[in-house]
Swiss-Prot record:
Homotrimer. It comes from Aeromonas salmonicida (strain A449). Pathway: Glycolipid biosynthesis; lipid IV(A) biosynthesis; lipid IV(A) from (3R)-3-hydroxytetradecanoyl-[acyl-carrier-protein] and UDP-N-acetyl-alpha-D-glucosamine: step 1/6. Its main location: cytoplasm. It is found in: Cytoplasm. The keyword Transferase applies. The keyword Electron transport does not apply. This is Acyl-[acyl-carrier-protein]--UDP-N-acetylglucosamine O-acyltransferase. NCBIfam families: lipid_A_lpxA (TIGR01852), PRK05289.1 (NF003657).
Amino acid sequence: MIDQTAIIHDTAIVHESAVIGKGVEIGPFSVIGAEVEIGDNTWVGSHVVIKGPAKLGRGNKIFQHTSIGEDCQDKKYAGERTFLEIGDNNVFRENCTVHRGTIQDQSLTKVGSGNLFMVNVHVAHDCIIGDNCIFANNATLAGHVVIGDFVIFGGLSAIHQFGRVGSHAFIGGCAALNKDVPPYVMAAGNYAKPFGVNSEGLRRRGFSAEAISAVKRAYKEIFRSGKTVEEVLPVLTEMAATEPAVQLYVDFLKDNERGIIRA
C-alpha cells in the first residue's frame, strides 16, 4: 500500500506488498522489496535498496547507494525468515549497509532512533543499537553487537562479534574493540584500552557535576583498584544506592561475559 501523498520517482521499483507512509519520498533507481514498511516523512535517495522483512519508522533519511535489510554475511545463513527494525529520525549516509538477523540469535537486527550513520558504516546481523548514537565514516559492527544510547564511534573503528558498548561511551578513531566497553568510558587503540570518563559528553547531555564525579569514582574502582568485575560489583552497587548514574555500570557489568577492556 502506497499513501497517496508519497512521491516515488518513475524509475524506482516498489514491491506491491510494501507499505509506504505519508509524505515519503523515494528517489531514482531505488528498489523497495517485499514486506518493507517505511514510516511517514522518510526520505530515500537514489540507488537505495531496502529488502524485507523490514520495518522503518518515521522521518528517516537514507542516502544514495545504501543497502538496508539485506541477507546477512554469516555463512550459516540458509535463507531463513529474519527481520530488521529501525526506529525514527535516523540518518544513513552514502554506502551504509544494515543486515537482517539470524535464527542463531533472535532473528532480528534492531536500530533505535536519532542515530547518525556516516559514510560506509556497516551494521551486521543481530546487532542491537540504542538511540542517539553517532558512527563516523567506515565504522564497522560485527554480528551480535549491542550498543547503548549516546555512543560515539570514531572513523574506521571496529568491534568484535558479540561485543558490547555501554551508553555514553566514546570510541576513538581506528579503535579495535575485542572486549566490552562499559558505560561512560573513552576507549582508543588497537586493541582498545580505557582512557578515562567521557566527561565532556556527559556535561553536554546535562549530567550534574555531582553525577560526573560519582561516575569518575566508579571508573577508578573498575579500572584502577585491581579488583575483578566480580569483586567490584558490590562496591558499585552500594555507590548506586545514592548515586543513580552509577547504576548503568552495575547493570552493564552484571551481564559481562566477554570481559571488559583493560589498561
